[in-house]
Amino acid sequence: MILLAAKGLSLLDVNPGLVVWTLITFLVVVLVLKKFAWDVILKALDERAQAVQNDIEKASELRLEAEALLKDYEARLNSAKDEANAIVAEARSDALKLKNKLLEETNQEVKAQKDQAVKEIELAKGKALEQLQTQFVEMTITIAGKVLEKQLKAEDYKAFIETELNKLGKLSA
């Protein structure tokens, strides 16, 4: 550039001979490329375009498969949740039934024990009344014997007192 400026030439000056040779060289290069490399370059570009198109189609297919799998997994998850909820509900129901059954059995046992206790109390009461009656008869005989200062036969007097007490018991009942 400095040399061109020293000679008084500018870079923007057009030299017609240089233009012709540049055009001829360009056309020769284009013809050589067309003859030997153009088909190879176009083929490579077409292959690359086809590969890109195949990759796009494959990605689209994979996306569709992924969406289908996601829907399937979501359906399975919802099914599993429903099944788990059903199992929990069944377990609650079974627990409630068991609780009610145990309460019923416990109530029956308590009632049976209460009935048994009432029977035992009635039996003990009867025995106590019988013992009281026997003691009362014996005391009456002893007192009557002392009052009369005469001893009667204990069995005769005892039978008489028991008969009278039974009459009194029937009247009070």
UniProtKB/Swiss-Prot annotation:
Main subcellular location of this protein, as a coarse class: membrane
The keyword Membrane belongs to this UniProt entry's keyword annotation: yes
Cellular location(s): Cell inner membrane
Transmembrane segments: 12-32
Topological relation to the membrane, as annotated: Single-pass membrane protein
Keywords: ATP synthesis, Cell inner membrane, Cell membrane, CF(0), Hydrogen ion transport, Ion transport, Membrane, Transmembrane, Transmembrane helix, Transport
GO molecular function ontology, one term from the record: proton-transporting ATPase activity, rotational mechanism
Assembly, per entry: F-type ATPases have 2 components, F(1) - the catalytic core - and F(0) - the membrane proton channel. F(1) has five subunits: alpha(3), beta(3), gamma(1), delta(1), epsilon(1). F(0) has three main subunits: a(1), b(2) and c(10-14). The alpha and beta chains form an alternating ring which encloses part of the gamma chain. F(1) is attached to F(0) by a central stalk formed by the gamma and epsilon chains, while a peripheral stalk is formed by the delta and b chains.
The protein's name in its UniProt record: ATP synthase subunit b
Species this chain originates from: Leptospira borgpetersenii serovar Hardjo-bovis (strain JB197)
Organism placement in taxonomy: Bacteria, Pseudomonadati, Spirochaetota, Spirochaetia, Leptospirales
